[in-house]
Amino acid sequence: MATVAAIGGQTADDSFGRDRLVILASSLGTIFEWYDFFVYGTLAALLGRLFFPTANPTAGLLLSLATFGAGFGVRPLGALLFGVIGDRVGRKYTFLATITLMGISTAAVGLLPTFSNAGLWAPGLLVALRLVQGLALGGEYGGAAIYVAEHAPSGKRGFYTSFIQASVVGGFLLSLVVTLLTVFALGKPAFDAWGWRVPFVVSLLLLALSLYIRLKLHESPVFKAMKAAGKVCEHPARESFGSLRNWGPILVALFGISAGLTVIWYTAQFSTLYFLQQTALVDDTHAKLLSGTAALLSAPFFVFFGWLSDKIGRKPLMVSGYGLTLLLLFPLFHGLAGAANPALARAAAAAPITVAGVDCRFNPFDKQQATACGQAMQFLSGRGIGFHRLRSFGLPLRIKIGSKIAVDLGDVHGKFDKALVEQALIRAGYPTTSDRVERSDLGIVLTVLAMGILSAMTYGPVAAILVELFPARIRYTSMSVPYHIGTGYFGGFLPLISQYIIAKTGDPYGGLWYTFAVVAVALFVTVVGLPETRHRDIAA
């Protein structure tokens, strides 16, 4: 593509313009993907009430999130399906199909009847649409990454493909703007009644723009040359997964690349936001605006590290990004706590909380815990307050705040008393919200930005790495499946796993151990198994 001959006599200016169109068309798919992801995630609680009505709001939310997760579950299947099509039919037509399915299934959510109108048909249709979208998404990223990389000059693959990763931020910011503007324009009651449909239907505009641009493009030069030479693979799945030689790169792509970079990205975007909202007690709107600001500032770093990988190599950046994440993960979150809610940080240091009881069974998914000790843990977890759990062979429940006993079960006649504990927490200096005057919004943005930069170090070069790991004839299939297993399972379930660990242990930083463990494995696999790929001929 870098030569005039390769582009059919086009001038250098024509080639440059075409390159920009290729990058834009591919990046729009990523914006689309993450726009839907953030919109649905933000509205999960509301959709739970509308489509899964139940006496237990927690159960409704979990069913809504399970429906959301169903899309992740089928992404590897979509990766296999569209990967085979992309390797046999071509890159362009495959990712035209995936963007169309994505757009229709996303917009259709905004047209669905709710449970009150259609009964069980409503959640059934919602699940069906999420499955269709999950299948389409399984083929979208691989197609976009390959299409850009196969157009890029050999010395600029990291730079060109990095725009796909940077556009994830675009999806987040677009969802934030559309949702907040809709709420502002309609008011909260109208938004909850029917306005929630607007962000989904608006995605039709993204679909129209994406199709308009993609229809202007031609097939990738690598695939055209391969087709002209009669080297198109007839059985991509069999050749990808039936060859022992190809299993090494697949496992490296899964455990060394996709799993590691995904949990860092989810931690940078989601865990920081949840931490601000649930632990640091920053109000929802400000938490999103501060996170959005940090995300916007981090976007250029994805492009920078993609460009840098063209200069120094892919592997050094991956190893450095993983290593720095292991070193800085916990310090950054402790710093975030101090910036977002200094009063809470002071109280936690001066008056740590212990919960002791004979029976401290605690299931974070139950609306009401069976024992007083479990109820105490549920209350503290809901308040975002950390605690240490001890086993007691005496009283059914004892809560200590610092050196003072706040509650002995006998003091409250055998029942857990929220009001009594709340009063004790306030006396010990535990705040009920983040003080906007005392907190440092700049400190919050800089800390979240630091996590975003760590994510950019590993996410920026990823598309180039995955494309370069596999031969052209089976590239779409071979890279898409491990990528979506990594992003869908290791990353997609990170919020659930992390929040479960936090609630179960009482440690507001406990969920970070999941990220730490996955990144540690990814670092080992990358050091041992990832070759340097930047000089490979991807036409081979």
Segments from the language model and where they lie:
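Low-complexity, proline/glycine-enriched hydrophobic segments characteristic of transmembrane helices
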Residues: 334-446
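C-terminal ends and interior cores of transmembrane alpha-helices
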Residues: 53, 100-119, 323-346, 427-436
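Central cavity-lining transmembrane alpha-helices of secondary-active solute carriers
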Residues: 65-84, 103-105, 170, 292-305
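Hydrophobic core of transmembrane alpha-helices in multi-pass small-molecule transporters
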Residues: 112, 118-138, 343-356, 438-457
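Extracytoplasmic gate region of multi-pass secondary transporters
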Residues: 40-41, 246-295, 333, 358-390, ...
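Extracellular/periplasmic helix-loop-helix junction of adjacent transmembrane segments
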Residues: 44-77
